[in-house]
């Protein structure tokens, strides 16, 4: 059995909100000085010790020095700088030649898994999003449509292409893909505003188009093919200009992945690829903490980040190029924290708005990543302690909630736990706040983020950290002290 070396987790975003979750006595407590820093270490049997009272700074992202952009020549640095300031890629790639016609340079084979059930539903004529069926014929694809977040993400992010590809051979799904694509283009001929043109949805959309191009470019209709290719190029240019207006770091990473993929797969893309790689490495360093967990502490966001890098790596493979080492290193960092949230049934726990993700989905994503690793043991900002004894698994939220600027479905779950044994879940949290807008009603989303929706003690029916609108969190828990040690069993 194990317990862990003393560790203090800090959250210092009280200034981001005036709302207090619990009355504070106003008593100032001196911070404990840090005498040492633990090394990131996965469950490899090694033992690292921390001095008692070490304080982890809240949400420390990786430093840029941890993940430097790929090494390039002085000439390429000038090209990247010129492209960043708006010089067209065609002028930098072939200044004396004609502009190349839009086309896809190679076919991508991504191992990123789709959901077959959702793909079958699409072929039957409706979207299947978080358990809700929505007929394609009745879907409003316009930028001004009032859709719930899960529908916005799926419909405008084109993640459904991945599901469709997983449901049947290519020739059987092309008609459905082109039908939905044509309907979307009719309402979104030019870049606009609203959820359809958020950086995240736009980045996911362009990346899906590039990865699954055969599904939307195999028609005999030259007009549709021309429209799709033109839309790819204009979308890539839009992302070049608007990437820094992303709502959060995960959305920015999606945008940078799409820019880099466009640089790989569209003609005259070398300047764009240089621009995209540098931006992506920087954004990844700001998304992920030094133990490999995303700063939102959300397993769903962790899975999304891994999936984006899997798709992008497949784009490099399609062009017979090696991805930057930083991308491979980041994938290796992202997988162990996700595995730390696996129960005995190999599915994920319900944390920070996520639901009980099935074992099959987790296994398929980890296999697609190509990373073989054990669950993260030296947990820092990720905050979830995992204790294994025989056939039982205990998961414990031993950290303050994520900072408001990082959270999308932030939950007041400090000191909550989940327990499973023999493949059965014994104690669980409610979870599901991030899924609100499907079968989970939007009206209860805020309640699912409350302390009372988690398996922990609630004092006076108050949240341990203030739960605000829009997935944000206010003041409350700022520090959690953990004492974990390995004990010999009797």
What are these regions (language model features)?
Residues 2-9:
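Extreme N-terminal basic, low-complexity initiation segments
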Residues 289-432:
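Carbohydrate-active enzyme catalytic cores, enriched for enzymes
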Residues 156, 255, 383, 415, ...:
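Residues that flank catalytic or metal-binding motifs in active/ligand-binding sites
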Residues 92-118, 133-167, 248-264:
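Long, acidic, intrinsically disordered low-complexity segments
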Residues 413-476:
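Active-site rim segments in enzyme catalytic domains, especially the processed small/beta chain
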Residues 10, 16-29, 33-36, 41-134:
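Extreme N-terminal leader/anchor segments
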């Amino acid at each position: 059995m194990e317990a862990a070396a003393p560790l203090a987790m800090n959250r210092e975003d009280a200034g981001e909100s005036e709302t207090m979750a619990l009355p504070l006595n106003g008593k100032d407590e001196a911070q404990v000085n840090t005498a040492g820093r633990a090394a990131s270490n996965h469950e490899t049997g090694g033992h690292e010790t921390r001095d008692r009272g070490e304080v982890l700074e809240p949400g420390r992202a990786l430093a840029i020095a941890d993940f430097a952009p790929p090494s390039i020549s002085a000439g390429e640095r000038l090209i990247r700088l010129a492209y960043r300031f708006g010089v067209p890629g065609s002028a930098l790639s072939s200044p004396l030649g004609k502009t190349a016609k839009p086309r896809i340079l190679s076919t991508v084979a991504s191992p990123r898994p789709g959901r077959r059930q959702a793909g079958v539903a699409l072929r039957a004529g409706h979207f299947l999003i978080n358990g809700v069926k929505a007929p394609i014929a009745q879907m409003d694809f316009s930028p001004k449509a009032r859709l719930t977040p899960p529908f916005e993400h799926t419909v405008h992010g084109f993640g459904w292409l991945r599901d469709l590809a997983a449901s049947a051979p290519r020739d059987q799904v092309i008609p459905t893909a082109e039908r939905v694509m044509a309907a979307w283009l009719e309402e979104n001929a030019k870049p606009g505003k609203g959820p359809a043109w958020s950086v995240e949805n736009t980045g996911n959309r362009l990346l899906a188009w590039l990865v699954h191009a055969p599904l939307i470019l195999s028609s005999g209709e030259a007009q549709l093919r021309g429209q799709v290719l033109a839309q790819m190029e204009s979308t890539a240019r839009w992302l070049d200009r608007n990437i820094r207006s992303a709502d959060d770091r995960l959305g920015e990473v999606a945008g940078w992945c799409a820019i880099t993929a466009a640089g790989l797969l569209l003609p005259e893309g070398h300047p764009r690829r240089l621009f995209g790689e540098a931006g992506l490495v920087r954004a990844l360093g700001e998304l992920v903490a030094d133990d490999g967990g995303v700063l939102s502490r959300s397993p769903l966001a962790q899975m999304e980040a891994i999936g984006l890098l899997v798709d992008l790596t497949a784009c490099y493979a399609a062009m017979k190029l090696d991805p930057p080492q930083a991308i491979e290193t980041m994938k290796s960092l992202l997988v162990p924290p996700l595995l730390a949230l696996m129960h005995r049934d190999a599915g994920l726990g319900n944390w920070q708005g996520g639901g009980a993700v099935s074992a099959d989905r987790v296994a398929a994503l980890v296999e697609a990543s190509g990373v073989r690793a054990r669950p993260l043991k030296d947990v820092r900002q990720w905050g979830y302690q995992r204790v294994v004894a025989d056939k039982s698994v205990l998961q414990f939220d031993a950290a303050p909630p994520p900072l408001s600027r990082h959270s999308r479905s932030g939950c007041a779950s400090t000191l909550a736990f989940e327990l499973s044994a023999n493949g059965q879940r014994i104690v669980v949290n409610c979870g599901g706040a991030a899924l609100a807008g499907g079968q989970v009603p939007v009206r209860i989303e805020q309640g699912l983020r409350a302390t009372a929706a988690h398996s922990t003690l609630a004092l006076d029916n108050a949240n341990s950290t203030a739960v605000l609108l829009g997935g944000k969190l206010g003041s409350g828990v700022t520090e959690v002290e953990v004492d974990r040690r390995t004990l010999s069993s009797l």
